[in-house]
Amino acid sequence: MLNMKEQYTKEVVPALQKEFGYKNVMQVPRIEKITLNMGVGEAVGDKKLIENAVADLERLAGQKVVVTKARKSVAGFKIREGWPIGCKVTLRGERMWDFFDRLVHIAVPRIRDFRGLNPKSFDGRGNYSMGVREQIIFPEIEYDKVDKIRGLDITITTTAGTDDEGRELLKAFGFPFKK
């Protein structure tokens, strides 16, 4: 079986060139980066929660995670400016391809009651965003060691100009969209 990067050059590029009539290989849309974000709003009361979220995300990504801080104080949410309220990581290059491979072939099929991903979750510029309700669908996260089940946001940024191009790019990789 080909890894995702090889699959892109050997199968996806020729298929998209044929479908959209690109003359140059560099016109073909490609995945630029994958961003993982975990909002931990309940970390306001307990600093240990943010540490556990960071550890989970680092295990998933295989690289250091950035802790996101509140931009301004909001009394309704009981947060102050500068308090840690989440964490994020941006994957590029080899780590991005490895994560994308695990996402498509291992994690997505493990989602409970899975009937396909929403094909309308594109932003108008060919980038796809999805939410995962449980981080335990990934094999790196051990179920026994999880203190709390958290969700995370996954954004796949592509060089595609339109949603149709982005959708076809992800479909060519075997992304399971709803019919």
Swiss-Prot record:
Keyword Ribosomal protein: yes
Pfam families (alphabetical): Ribosomal_L5, Ribosomal_L5_C
UniProt GO MF annotations: rRNA binding; structural constituent of ribosome; tRNA binding
Disulfide linkage: none
Superkingdom per UniProt: Bacteria
Classification via InterPro entries: Ribosomal_uL5 (IPR002132), Ribosomal_uL5_bac-type (IPR020930), Ribosomal_uL5_C (IPR031309), Ribosomal_uL5_CS (IPR020929), Ribosomal_uL5_dom_sf (IPR022803), Ribosomal_uL5_N (IPR031310)
GO cellular component: ribonucleoprotein complex; ribosome
Glycosyltransferase found in the keyword field: no
Any one GO BP annotation for this protein: translation
Keywords from the UniProt entry: Ribonucleoprotein, Ribosomal protein, RNA-binding, rRNA-binding, tRNA-binding
Subunit: Part of the 50S ribosomal subunit; part of the 5S rRNA/L5/L18/L25 subcomplex. Contacts the 5S rRNA and the P site tRNA. Forms a bridge to the 30S subunit in the 70S ribosome.
NCBIfam families listed in its UniProt record: PRK00010.1
Family of this protein: Belongs to the universal ribosomal protein uL5 family.
HAMAP family listed in its UniProt record: Ribosomal_uL5_B
Function according to Swiss-Prot or TrEMBL: This is one of the proteins that bind and probably mediate the attachment of the 5S RNA into the large ribosomal subunit, where it forms part of the central protuberance. In the 70S ribosome it contacts protein S13 of the 30S subunit (bridge B1b), connecting the 2 subunits; this bridge is implicated in subunit movement. Contacts the P site tRNA; the 5S rRNA and some of its associated proteins might help stabilize positioning of ribosome-bound tRNAs.
Protein name: Large ribosomal subunit protein uL5
